[in-house]
């Protein structure tokens, strides 16, 4: 059975990507708790949506944590197999993916995951501030357009920045890549905000 799985994995990992254009890709590193030689291995996952709207797994690979070297290896392999630069990539801010994608597919735009970002912001706030902060963050990523999102981000920084500057900076420092999804069709926004 293991040999069959290995054959299927090799076939999947070597298939041509020349005939497919991926508009958007979502990336994440999944840390699994299994007993291996090292505890720093994670699964690097890249899912893409084609121009026809079909979503599919593009690549799955093991990597050392979520290092830029591991992501670059995965991306270079996809490029070698014919993958062209996706228009937009969505992922969390902790990934080494961003350095790797800038090197391998420099024309790909970046969108940070709002689910992860919300968790990061809340971690920098006392629990008593969470309900209001969640509402304020939702006003940013659920705004009617990019201008309203930027205005909501400024309001968030004004409300929370004096007492909790680290929480506010998590939004203001990354604002351009948090609101990038607004540059794409509105019907795609719900999918592009998060991994």
Task: Locate each region found by the language model.
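Non-catalytic, well-ordered alpha-helical scaffold segments
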Residues: 41, 95, 116-119, 131-135, ...
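RNase H-like nuclease fold core
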Residues: 2-91, 95, 99, 104-107, ...
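A short, ordered amphipathic alpha-helix with a cationic face
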Residues: 62-64, 123-127, 190-195
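Acidic/histidine-rich catalytic cores and adjacent linkers
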Residues: 143-195
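Short, charged, low-complexity patches
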Residues: 68-71, 126, 130
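A polyampholytic, Gly/Pro-enriched intrinsically disordered region
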Residues: 128-145
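Inter-helix linker motif
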Residues: 106-123
């Amino acid at each position: 059975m293991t040999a069959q799985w290995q054959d299927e994995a090799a076939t999947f990992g070597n298939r041509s990507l020349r005939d497919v254009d991926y508009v958007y890709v979502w990336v994440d590193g999944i840390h699994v708790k299994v007993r291996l030689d090292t505890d720093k291995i994670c699964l690097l996952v890249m899912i893409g949506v084609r121009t026809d709207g079909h979503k599919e797994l593009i690549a799955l690979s093991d990597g050392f944590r979520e290092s830029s070297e591991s992501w670059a290896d995965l991306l270079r392999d996809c490029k070698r197999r014919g993958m062209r630069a996706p228009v937009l990539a969505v992922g969390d801010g902790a990934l080494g993916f961003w350095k790797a994608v800038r090197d391998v597919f420099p024309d790909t735009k970046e969108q940070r995951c709002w689910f992860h970002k919300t968790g990061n912001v809340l971690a920098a706030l006392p629990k008593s501030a969470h309900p209001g902060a969640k509402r304020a963050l939702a006003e940013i990523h659920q705004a009617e357009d990019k201008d309203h999102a930027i205005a909501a981000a400024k309001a968030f920084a004004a409300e929370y920045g004096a007492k909790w500057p680290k929480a506010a900076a998590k939004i203001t420092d990354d604002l351009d890549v948090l609101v990038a999804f607004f540059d794409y069709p509105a019907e795609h926004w719900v999918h592009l905000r998060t991994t």
